[in-house]
Structure formats: structure tokens, C-alpha cells
Amino acid sequence: MVIYKAKNYQDLSRKAANIISAQIIMKPDCVLGLATGSSPVGTYKQLIEWYNKGDLDFSKVTTINLDEYKSLGPDNDQSYRYFMNTNLFDHVNIDKAHTFVPDGLEPDPQKACASYNEIIRSHGGIDLQLLGLGRNGHIGFNEPGAAFEKETHCVDLTESTIEANKRFFASEDDVPKQAYTMGIKNIMQAKKILLIAGGEEKAEALKNSLYGPITPSVPASILQLHNDVTVIADEAALSLIM
């Protein structure tokens, strides 16, 4: 595991984008595992900037996203498909037929999850998986207590996650209560993992994930067992470690 300290969010985003762009340059037809939320927005902006300068070519890249809210379609502005289109896909020369997000409108969880596992397998797995870190150590929607051996599955969102998300919706009743997410097993099968974390509110989760016991109560702690993990975090997130 390699840990890089970033001066601030902009520096964190640039460092993360450097690693992703190197992956694309080294393997133009690579499979990228992508994340949503506030953490990777700056990374995606930097990738778009380099694409606009002619430094990056996404035409052969495949992307597979971590998760999606169950019941939200791609045109819903709170869906993760919409987020990815808005923050990355609409701004680069990627073939959207090669961008995958779980089907939030598939009502049958077994069908949705089996289909997504097959998408990952049929593309030969993920070359580089980008991850954010939840305040409770969650990765994707794998909340504390999630079994390490699970593949893509349907999860009931915790009260804390629903609470954190309600600011994005008109009312709490509109907040999805379930999501489809890649499991820990899918994530751990990625060839490389890039974990980004910023802010003092992530400090305890980052410390527990990197140096605490490996336990389902801190889902990201399993990353200690992966043989190629890069962590990029700012000074605030690293305050309990460095």
C-alpha cells in the first residue's frame, strides 16, 4: 500500500487523475471502476481538462460504476448514471455503450445483480478501481457488517446514509431506501485500487481502514489485504495517521 499526502482537495484530485490517466495511456482499452459522490468530482474535472488539451483518449475505455439507487432511472438527476454523464461521460470521447452502471429500474434484485456480475466478468475484470471512503468506512454501498465474500447485491440503506442523502431530494420520502452495489469481493478482484479521502470527518475512518483490525464493521479495512492499493488523502484526513 502506498499513501500520498495531498496539500488540499485540488492537489488530491490532480494526483488521483494522474494515476487514472497513466492507466489509460498504458492500456487504452482498460476497464475503469468508477465512483460517485463529492470526492471524485475534482478528479473527473481534471481528466476532462487533460482530454480537452488532447492528452487523453477515452475512445477505447470501458467503465463500470460501483453502485446505483434502486428505483431511480438514468434521467433522474439524483441517479448515479446522471451524475456520471454530467461529471464525466458527456465531456469526453467515451462510447456510452461501454459505460456501465447498475440498472436502478430493474425491479428484480437477483436479475439486476447477476447481470452486473456478468458484465464485470465478461470484460475481464477491472484494471483500476476508484473508491471514495464513507465516514463509517463504507466503500460503494457496502455498509458496516457487509460480508466480505459478497458480489453485486441489493442493500437496504442505513439511516445515516439516508440522512446524508436527503439534502439532495425534495423530501426524505423521496430518498431511495435501497441500492444495487458491487460487493467487497468484486472490489477486491480489481487489479489496482485507488482510494481517495478528504476532510477531517474522514480521519477516523481512514485510520481504522488502513491500520485497524480487518473487520466487516469497517468495510474498507479489507483493502489492507489487496496487493496494489494507492491512497491519496489530504492533511485533514491523514491527521490521525501522519
What are the functions of these language-model segments?
Residues 33-37, 65, 102-103, 130-133, ...:
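Short beta-strand segments
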Residues 46-57, 80, 144-153, 212-214:
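A glycine- and small-aliphatic-rich helix-loop capping segment at beta-alpha/alpha-beta transitions
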Residues 140-184:
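Class I SAM-dependent methyltransferase SAM-binding "motif I" and its flanking Rossmann-like core
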Residues 185, 189-242:
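ATP/nucleoside-binding phosphotransfer catalytic cores, i.e., glycine-rich phosphate-binding loops
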Residues 56-129:
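Ligand-binding beta-strand-loop-alpha-helix segment within the catalytic cores
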Residues 124-150:
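Glycine-rich phosphate-binding loop
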Residues 1-32:
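N-terminal glycine-/serine-/threonine-rich phosphate-binding loop
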Residues 26-52:
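Glycine-rich N-terminal segment of FAD-binding domains in flavoprotein oxidoreductases
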